[in-house]
C-alpha cells in the first residue's frame, strides 16, 4: 500500500484500488482496480477531506484528486539532483479565508507557489527570488495562516515558517527566511509538526551544533516554539533519536525505529511500541531514499495505523 487514511473505522488506500480494510480483518478490493499509470508511493488528504494528492516521494510527478477523480497533474521542477535526494514538496490545506490550496514547487525546487486547488489559479504570481533552500516537508497551520517547511540548505536540515496571508498579497514573502529566526536552533532538524495554529514542535538530530547559543534548540532536543511570541516555550533534551512527527492533541508521535508517544513539553516517553519496526528517516534529504513511514492518526486521536510491508498495524493510544 502507498497511502493510508481513515474513513470512519475503515482504512483506505486511495492511490491503489482503492482498497478498503475493515477492523474485522476483511478487505474490500474492487474487481476493476483503478490505476494512475505512474509509480506513486505516497499521498496526502486535505483537512476538509475534499482533495487528495498522490505522488512519488522521490519523483517529479503528482496528481491532485477530488473524490478519487483526477483534477489535474502536478509536477516539480526536475532540477539536477533535487528529485533524487529531496522528498517531494507538497501540502494541501485551506487559507484563512477558506480557499483550499495546493502549496508546491512546480517551477524551481527553491521557489514555493500557492495554487487554488479547485481552479489551478496561481495565487503567488509575480517576480520571485530563488533562496538557496530545497523546500520540502510542507505543512499548513490548522488556521491556514502559516506555512512551515522542513527542507535543506547547504547540507543542513532547516525549518522555516511563512505568513500565508501576506504571501497571497506579496509572493516575495515566501522567498526569504520566513518569520522564525534561523538562529532559534543550532543543529540539524530531524522533524517538525504543528501542535496547533500557533505552536510547532521541532525535533533535532544528534549532529554537532553549528554555533554556540544557550538560547537555541540544540542537538537531540525537542522544542515547542510559539510563532506569535517568537520564542521557545519549552525545550527538553532527550535520550533517543526522533523521526517523523505527528501531532496528537497536546502530545506528539515520533516515528523512528519504532513508534513512540511523547510529551513535547518534557520529552518524556508516554508509550512506545518496540515490536512495531519502522524506518529511521530524519529530515527530508538523503542521497539514498529511506522512505517516510506511512501512518494515519484516527481523527479521534485514539488509534494510529501504520502500514507494514504485508499488513497494517493499528496501535491503541493511551488517553491523555
Language-model features, listed with the residues they occupy:
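Asp-box/WD-like beta-propeller blade repeats and closely related beta-sheet repeat scaffolds
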Residues: 70-99, 104-110, 122-135
